[in-house]
Design a protein with these regions (language model features):
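Conserved phosphate-binding loops in N-terminal lobes of ATP-dependent enzymes
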Residues: 2-106, 118-119, 208-262
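General structural feature for long, well-ordered alpha-helical segments within catalytic domains
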Residues: 7-11, 18-25, 42-45, 49, ...
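Alpha/propeptide regions of enzymes that mature by internal proteolysis
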Residues: 51-119, 249-262, 274-280, 290-309, ...
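Flexible, acidic active-site loops/lids enriched in D/E/S/T/G that coordinate Mg2+ and/or position polar
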Residues: 101-220, 311-320, 325-326
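Flexible, charged surface loops at secondary-structure boundaries
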Residues: 115-117, 185-186, 269-275, 335-340, ...
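Conserved mixed alpha/beta catalytic, RNA-binding, or beta-rich assembly cores of soluble enzyme
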Residues: 208-274, 280-425, 429
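RNase H-like, two-metal
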Residues: 250-251, 555-564
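Gly/Ser/Thr/Ala-enriched C-terminal appendages of enzymes
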Residues: 342-548, 552, 564, 575, ...
Length: 596
């Protein structure tokens, strides 16, 4: 849409006004805004919102995605892990995760101060508990925004924090009690699933495509009661294919033999050539044990398994080493230059947060998405892994059924490990009792809604979105996307840094990291907001070391912080910082507890 100079100035002015809490916090100046409608009926900006949120909250959340992408790209050590040792690469990845998580957390903190007084955002699923590719369990979880993080006005946040603590600590306080308390208090809770940096390895290695930030907001909390992360099998198809199969009483989902899927595709798109059916799955030799059975099914059917470097409709090149979320936007058909129908679909597995995010896109993209919960280890091939979470550890034949899947005798340690993984999913109240999971199974109420926000650090070949572009040393263009069942828009911001690079870097770095790197915390003026800021940073940087006490305090156990996450030297500085704040500002930091 072409805008006159006056219309453009008005557009920028309103966006700047609505998003000023985030722009001010991050010391950014909004130079320009470009809005491109991708789906839905185009209406003049500011006349109609496209989600369950009001227009201002849509703009604040869109800016949150933009600021996270910009800050991570500029200050997250992009490309510094290239050709480095495994340990050095993982250090870069964790630093990148820390910047992205901090930028999004700070933006959400300021954005949600504009919520109605009885509203809150609750993070229900995050990405970072499991080791990333190339990491081991000993390296600890990654900086993240995970389950239980609350963003709201202070009184609402304090009240909701207390209920989340009860969910974590009290066995007799579950989802039913949590939901009843929310209703009785008259509070509206928006759930969220967040991955602050998708494709972290590609980011650390300096790959030109892939890295993005993803935040999904829902009009209700997800039915999940504990921090949980594992793998999930997933299959995404155009809804037309599933509807066509239903006409012949054929059920299409992740558990369906792929031969039946192909038959339904050919019924839906008469004359489509199998070589023009493109199936995207994660690839690589390391995944052959997990996915070999699935790859064989597709290869035997004569379809095209997407390979690394395959040219996409956008002109960009596919990658299959990571990144299961972005390809969801491409699922569907198009007509090529030879007037032949091409179909792209998504199969395989993903981490649970990414899988849930992709599944919740289905009403916005006219897709059908089905999931199956796997374990966090995924040691069995996919054809067996998909049955593990249905086993019942309390049954006498549990060990026997496990051995049938492994096709060998398993020791008691293996039995205990699988018992623990299954029980973790049950305790988090993951929906395990269905043949497959669809997005609506995560929600307590049927009328659920979603607003999906993406911010692109680098070019995205699946949607054609551009990554962060440098105009000059102070001005950058940042592309974002908002997708809802009503419409979809691409919003590109031109943002100017208001500080010199050294000062701007400090703004995007967690306060605790600045202290660890040498900033003098003793001479820095202390504000009451530092209490909440440091609390949030601890939850982001070392969540596994925190214990939430029934009296509202948080106990930090330094022995649970892996040195790969925070070195022993830096842990010593961190303890010194926290002890100083606790001693000199005991009222503001009454929530902080540390063993002697």
């Amino acid at each position: 849409m072409n805008l006159s100079d006056r219309e453009r100035r008005d557009l920028v002015s309103q966006w700047a006004f609505d998003t000023r809490p985030i722009l001010g916090r991050m010391h950014l100046w909004l130079e320009n805004v470009e809005v491109e409608w991708l789906r839905g009926k185009q209406t003049p900006e500011f006349t109609k919102n496209i989600s369950f949120m009001d227009g201002r909250m849509e703009r604040l959340m869109t800016m949150t995605a933009a600021v996270t992408a910009l800050g991570t790209q500029l200050f997250g050590r992009f490309g510094e892990g290239k050709d480095k040792t495994k340990d050095e690469l993982n250090r870069v990845k964790k630093d990148a995760d820390a910047i992205s998580a901090y930028a999004m957390s700070e933006s959400l903190w300021y954005a949600t101060r504009q919520l109605p007084e009885n509203h809150a955002v609750l993070v229900c699923m995050g990405e970072g508990l499991m080791p990333k590719v190339g990491e081991t369990k000993e390296m600890g979880s990654n900086p993240q925004l995970g389950f239980g993080r609350v963003y709201a006005r202070p009184q609402v946040a304090k009240w909701l924090d207390g209920r989340v603590t009860r969910l974590l600590n009290q066995k007799n306080y579950g989802w039913a009690e949590f939901r009843e308390d929310i209703k009785n208090e008259g509070i509206t809770v928006w759930g969220s699933a967040i991955d602050t940096l998708e494709n972290t390895s590609r980011f650390a290695k300096g790959k030109p495509t892939g890295p993005l930030t993803v935040m999904h907001l829902f009009n209700q909390p997800l039915h999940i009661t504990k921090p949980y992360e594992a793998y999930m099998g997933n299959l995404f198809l155009p809804i037309k294919v599933v509807r066509k199969a239903e006409e012949k009483s054929v059920l299409l989902d992740f558990m369906t033999p792929r031969k039946k899927v192909i038959e339904a595709i050919e019924e839906t798109y008469p004359g489509i050539k199998r070589k023009n059916i493109h199936v995207w799955t994660l690839g690589g030799k390391s995944r052959e044990k997990r996915l070999g059975w699935l790859w064989k099914q597709w290869n035997d059917l004569g379809v095209h398994l997407v390979e690394d470097g395959w040219v996409l409709p956008s002109g960009g090149k596919a990658f299959i080493d990571s990144g299961t979320y972005a390809p969801t936007y491409l699922v569907g058909t198009w007509i090529d230059g030879n007037k032949q129908t091409q179909l792209f679909l998504l199969d395989g597995y993903a981490a649970s947060a990414e899988a849930m995010q992709a599944a919740s896109l289905t009403p916005a993209l006219d897709l059908d998405g089905t999931l199956v919960t796997f374990t966090s280890k995924f040691e069995l091939p996919i054809e067996k892994e998909r049955f593990v979470m249905r086993l019942k550890p309390g049954q006498p034949d549990f060990k026997q059924k496990l051995e049938e899947l492994f096709q060998k005798t398993v020791d008691q340690d293996t039995v205990k490990k699988y018992t623990r993984m299954i029980m973790e999913a049950r305790e988090a109240e993951m929906p395990l009792h269905h043949r497959v999971i669809r997005a609506h199974d995560f929600f307590p109420e049927k009328n659920w809604d979603v607003a999906a926000f993406s911010g692109y650090m680098c070019d995205d070949p699946y949607t054609g979105a551009r990554g962060v572009e440098c105009i000059d040393d102070q001005i950058y263009r940042v592309t974002t996307r908002i997708s809802t069942p009503r419409a979809g828009k691409r919003v590109t911001f031109t943002l100017r840094l208001m500080e010199k690079p050294k000062e701007q870097r400090l703004i995007f770095n967690p306060l605790l990291i600045r202290f660890i790197y040498g900033e003098d915390f003793r001479t820095r003026p202390v504000k009451i907001s530092d209490s909440g800021r440091i609390r949030n940073e601890l939850q982001t940087l070392c969540s596994e070391a925190l214990e939430y006490q029934s009296n509202g305090k948080i106990l930090i156990r330094f022995d649970r912080i892996p040195p790969e996450v925070i070195s022993l030297k830096d842990q010593k500085i961190l303890r010194e910082v926290l002890e100083w704040y606790k001693k000199h500002h005991p009222i503001w930091f009454h929530w902080l507890d540390m063993p002697s």
